Design a protein with these regions (language model features):
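Compositionally biased terminal segments of proteins
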Residues: 1-259
Length: 259
C-alpha cells in the first residue's frame, strides 16, 4: 500500500491555522522557522523558496486538536492512552488528488525539554492573525540540529537547508535584539548560541554538513563590549574548535578500525 503524499499548507492555510490556534499552543518546527524567517526578513534558499515545510506543528493538547479540526472542518484524531506517540492529536484534510494536509499537536519536540520550550516561547501579536506563541528562535535552531542528529529521515536536502536557514534567522534575531534591547540582552543570546554549538549533536552536524551555530553570532554588531572581543569570544571559539577536532579524530579512528 502506497503512503499518501503530504500536501503543502498554503499561506492562507497557515494564517488561518495560526489565528485559530491563538496562544493556546506553541508553534514549533518548520513553521516556527518559516514564521521567524518572514518576520525578520531573512532570504530563503532556493530549496525552501516555495515552502520551508509542508505541515504545521504545535506543542498543545488534545483539546486544541479538536478545536482546530472542528473550526477548519477537517478530520481530527486523538491517540489512546496506550498509544506510544509524542502526538497529542492530529488534524488532517485529504485533497481531491489524495494528498493530505496535516497539523500535528505534540507533547514536546525531540532533544529539548517541553517546559523550557514553553518558558522561552515568545508571545506575539501578529497583524491579521492575532495573539500567537512561537518557539524561541534559538530553540528553533537547536531543534533543527537535533532533528538532523537524531532523525535519519530529516537528513535530506530540505533538512540541511533548514539548519542553515535557522542559523541565518538567529543571526538576524540577535541583530534585532541588539538594536532594540541592547548588548546586555544580546550577550545572553550569544552565550546560549555558544552553548548550542558546544553540544555533541551540534558538533557532529557541523562535521557532517558544515552547519555552524557560531555563524549565528553577528559579532561585528557588538561594538561596546571590549571583553567580548578580547576574551570571551576567543574562549568560545577555542573551546568549540577543540570539541570539533576531538570528535573529528574519534570519527576518523572509528572509520579506520572498520577497514
Amino acid at each position: 500500500m502506497t503512503e499518501a503524499r503530504e500536501a503543502v499548507l498554503s499561506p492562507t492555510d497557515v494564517k488561518t491555522i495560526l489565528g485559530l490556534c491563538s496562544a493556546e499552543g506553541v508553534l514549533v518546527g518548520g513553521q516556527a522557522l518559516a514564521f521567524w524567517v518572514d518576520h525578520l526578513g531573512v532570504r530563503r534558499p532556493q530549496e525552501l523558496e516555495i515552502a520551508v515545510t509542508a505541515d504545521a506543528d504545535f506543542i498543545g493538547d488534545s483539546a486544541l486538536a479538536k478545536k482546530l479540526g472542528e473550526a477548519l472542518g477537517w478530520k481530527w484524531w486523538i491517540p489512546n492512552l496506550d498509544d506510544a506517540t509524542p502526538q497529542t492529536g492530529k488534524v488532517t484534510h485529504t485533497l481531491a488528488d489524495g494528498s493530505i494536509k496535516q497539523i500535528d499537536l505534540l507533547s514536546g519536540v525531540i532533544g529539548l525539554t517541553t517546559l523550557d520550550v514553553k518558558r522561552r516561547a515568545i508571545d506575539m501579536d501578529v497583524p491579521e492573525i492575532g495573539p500567537l506563541r512561537v518557539m524561541h528562535p534559538i530553540d528553533v535552531l537547536d531543534s533543527r540540529i537535533h532533528n538532523l542528529d537524531l532523525l535519519p529521515g530529516k537528513r535530506n536536502a530540505a533538512g540541511i537547508a533548514q539548519g542553515a536557514l535557522a542559523t541565518a534567522m538567529v543571526r538576524a534575531f540577535i541583530s534585532h535584539e541588539l538594536e532594540s534591547r541592547g548588548e546586555r540582552v544580546a550577550l545572553k543570546l550569544l552565550e546560549r548560541v555558544a552553548a548550542v554549538a558546544a553540544e555533541p549533536g551540534a558538533v557532529r552536524i557541523f562535521l557532517l554538513y558544515g552547519i555552524d551555530p557560531l555563524n549565528a553570532i553577528p559579532l561585528e554588531d557588538f561594538r561596546t563590549n571590549a571583553a567580548l572581543h578580547t576574551k570571551l569570544w576567543p574562549q568560545i571559539t577555542e573551546r568549540v574548535s577543540a570539541q570539533r577536532e576531538k570528535m573529528r579524530r574519534l570519527i576518523q579512528t572509528a572509520k579506520s578500525r572498520r577497514k
